């Protein structure tokens, strides 16, 4: 059984995106602190936040603080998605397609794969996803990992990233084993 993983180029791209996401998260933390004038010391945080609120916050403080708060909460979810993409492995087996990444292991039976849908038709690096008949995230025992995986991928889809080595071979094997039709050719005649 062959396991398909990200190519070196795909890993570099994921690493660049990961560094960018961490930089955005650091900027959001710094901006949130400076906008509200609070202290991140755990012993002084609530007191400094309370003092800032009691002094009154203007719109010029509230709007950027809320935007930074959204980034502070959402960026770790993006980081998880990038890390899960970084270590993703797709293994076709006789039972179905096994997906493994960062402690997540899910087996998608061939009969559960309804379609392979093109999400991004970029000529150089197209992105496809498997459309599934149901939710198979229940196979993930850890509830935190199950939540993070569902946030990253959804419950009824599984992306097949553009940077996967021998990606077309994986797509052909999935279509053959799942009994799916080949997509219409997009080449000009």
Question: Can you say where each PLM-predicted feature lies in the sequence?
Answer:
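Canonical hydrophobic alpha-helical transmembrane segment
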Residues: 23, 59-79
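Ser/Thr- (and often Asn-) enriched beta-sheet segments in non-cytosolic proteins
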Residues: 3-5, 91, 98, 131
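Generic detector of contiguous secondary-structure segments
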Residues: 11-23, 108-121
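Short regulatory "switch" loops immediately downstream of catalytic or recognition motifs
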Residues: 29-40, 119-121, 132-141
């Amino acid at each position: 059984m062959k396991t398909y993983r990200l190519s070196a180029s795909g890993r570099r791209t994921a690493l660049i995106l990961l560094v960018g996401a961490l930089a955005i998260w650091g900027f959001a933390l710094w901006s949130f602190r400076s906008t509200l004038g609070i202290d991140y010391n755990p012993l002084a945080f609530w007191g400094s936040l309370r003092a800032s609120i009691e002094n009154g916050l203007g719109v010029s403080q509230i709007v950027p603080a809320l935007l930074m708060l959204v980034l502070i909460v959402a960026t770790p979810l993006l980081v998880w998605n990038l890390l899960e993409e970084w270590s993703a492995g797709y293994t076709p087996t006789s039972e179905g397609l096994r997906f493994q990444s960062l402690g997540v292991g899910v087996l998608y039976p061939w009969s559960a794969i309804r379609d392979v849908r093109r999400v991004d038709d970029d000529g150089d690096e197209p992105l496809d996803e498997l459309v599934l008949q149901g939710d198979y995230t229940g196979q993930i025992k850890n509830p935190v990992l199950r939540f993070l995986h569902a946030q990253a991928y959804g419950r009824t889809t599984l992306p097949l990233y553009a940077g996967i080595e021998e990606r077309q071979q994986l797509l052909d094997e999935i279509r053959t084993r799942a009994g799916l039709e080949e997509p219409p050719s997009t080449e000009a005649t």
